[in-house]
Amino acid sequence: MARLAAFDMDGTLLMPEHHLGRETIATLARLRERDITLTFATGRHVLEMRHILGTLSLDAYLITGNGTRIHSLEGDVLHRQDLDPQVADTVMHHAWDTRASMHVFNDNGWFTGQEIPALLQAHVYSGFRYQVIDIKSIPAHQVTKICFCGDHDDLIRLRIQLNEALEERAHLCFSAVDCLEVLPLGCNKGSALAVLSNHLGLSLADCMAFGDAMNDREMLGSVGRGLIMGNAMPQLIAALPHLSVIGHCGNQAVSHFLTHWLDNPHLPYSPE
C-alpha cells in the first residue's frame, strides 16, 4: 500500500469551479486515518496553499510553485530552488513576440504588469490575487518562476522563442493549455517529490500521485502508481500511455478512485 499520496490541485483535486468537493475532503481525511502522508503538489503559491490548507484541518506537506518550494507540516522550508538570475533577467526584460501576459512569482507573491480580472476566477475561494507593478523592477535574484498566460498556439510559438534564448538554462512546461511556465533547470514536481520522499525515509515506489497537465508528467512517471485524470491534457496521456486514466475532476474522480482503493484494494477499478 502507498505511504505517500501526492495531488495536483487544478484539474485534479479541485473541481472545475476551483474548490474541493465534500467527498474529496472526506476521502483525504480517511487517508490520514490510515497513516498515509499527504502532499499537495501544485503550481500555486505557498501563501495561497497555506490558506486553503487552513480551511481543511488536514496535515499535509506542500510542494508549491511547480517544485520550487517544499514546506513541512509545520510550515518550515525543506527545499527551495529559484530561477537563475540571468534567466529571470532575460525573460523579464526581453521584448517577446507574444500577446500572452507575463506573471512573476517570488516568496512575496504573484506579480503582473496589468489588471487581468479573468485570471482571479481560479482563486476566488482563497482570495489570493496578483499585485500590479512594473515587472522590470523585480530583483532577478528573487524570482522563483515566471509564467505566461494566453492562447495555446501563441504560447507554442513563444516556447520556441524562449528555448532559443534560454537554451538549456531553464525548464519549460505547460501547467495548463493556456499557461506556459519558466522554471529553474531540473525543477519539477517529480524532482521535488523525490526530495520530500527522501526526507520522509520513503522511496518514490511508496508514492501514488494524481495529475492532469504536463507539469505533472515527471511526478506521475516516477512514482509507484501514477493516475491521470480523464480531463487531462492529451499530451500528458500520450506521454505516459502506460498509466491508468480515471474520471473527470468535476465528478471528484480522485475521491472515487481512492474510496475504491481503500475499500476494495484487490479488485479492479473502473471510473464508471
UniProtKB/Swiss-Prot annotation:
Cofactor: Mg(2+)
Entry's EC annotation: 3.6.1.-
Family assignment from sequence similarity: Belongs to the HAD-like hydrolase superfamily. Cof family.
Domain of life: Bacteria
Organismal lineage: Bacteria, Pseudomonadati, Pseudomonadota, Gammaproteobacteria, Enterobacterales
GO molecular function: 4-amino-5-hydroxymethyl-2-methylpyrimidine diphosphatase activity; magnesium ion binding; phosphatase activity
Active site per the UniProt annotation: D8
Residues given in the record as Mg(2+) binding sites: D8, D10, D212
Root EC class: hydrolase
Keyword annotations: Hydrolase, Magnesium, Metal-binding
Substrates-to-products reaction catalysed: 4-amino-2-methyl-5-(diphosphooxymethyl)pyrimidine + H2O = 4-amino-2-methyl-5-(phosphooxymethyl)pyrimidine + phosphate + H(+)
Xref: InterPro entries: Cof, HAD-like_sf, HAD-SF_hydro_IIB, HAD_sf, HMP-PP_phosphatase
Record keyword Hydrolase present: yes
NCBIfam families xref list: Cof-subfamily, HAD-SF-IIB, PRK15126.1
Organism: Salmonella agona (strain SL483)
Name of the protein described by the UniProt record: HMP-PP phosphatase
UniProt function note: Catalyzes the hydrolysis of 4-amino-2-methyl-5-hydroxymethylpyrimidine pyrophosphate (HMP-PP) to 4-amino-2-methyl-5-hydroxymethylpyrimidine phosphate (HMP-P).
Gene: cof
